[in-house]
Amino acid sequence: MYNGVYETDKKVFTGEKFNGKDVKNTLKSDIIKYFTSQGNFVLEKNAEIKDEKTTLKGDQLEYNKNTEIAKSPKAFEIKYDDYDIFGSSGTLDKKTNHLTGNNVLIKSKLNEEFKGDRVDGTLDNMNLDFIGNVSGRIYQDGVPVNFKGDFVRAYFKKDTQGKNQIQRVEIRKNAVIEKEGTTLYSDYLEIQPEKKLVFGKDNTKAVLKDKDGTITTVTSNMMTGNLNTEIVDLVGKVVVVRKDKDKTLNATSTKAKIKNKDNMIELRGNVVVDDGESVITSDEADYNTKTNKLKARGNVFVDYKVNEKKSVTNANQINSGYNKILKK
């Protein structure tokens, strides 16, 4: 250190090119102010506080050696494990590695990303809450999964090498998940990347785009799905709307299964299908989105919109079901 001056009346030590160490933290900066009676360091320009796990950098850092709490009133950067953390201001408890910060962006070496207006959580287990204008990106089998919402809670676990690995992401309020041709909306969405699962409840909606560009929109009370297989199970007040360039199909049911890659929509319970030409009610129905073929089973009733009505109720017809090619 150079140009050190101690002001006895103020109990303040100032200097340049500081490099020092307490029990477990190394501190350095171009300019230092040390308030001896309080144990407070003010590090300015190229400031750094480092221990075995964490490196905190900023243009201005404040550190209390008694509490081991570091504060950054200005922009900061933290390097922890495989993660780089950036923020406009924040506080890091060096004893517990608890971080609170504003306008935070977290990036991993795997190109995963989380950002939000605020963050609150512990770095050691990487269980973090992101609050306000949250967005991020994780990967499933190398394919990006993007998400956003008002609030996100991220859970990590240690892998066999002791590295933190994303285990679960909860997204609340205005939640959106996007992967390739699938977009999910809800008040609550949850991703489990390791199991390749997604779960949604409360005002759920799935929008699926097939290879031909046709859009299928599905709403329900609850949904579970696999983003890799693009199979989505829906329960409660299911509504399906499928639009192509020529027509729209509307369907409702109690439950449904969307098999997007197999071009199949399976409707179960109190099924009603309106293809524009007729309204078909049944206990079950399978709709092939590629062939436009609908197969209905169990208590089938067809109401043609040209006022021709046909009830399909005898035993043979119920067993064989009802088949119709839905014209484009």
Report each predicted region and the residues it spans.
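Mature-chain termini and adjacent capping regions
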Residues: 1-328
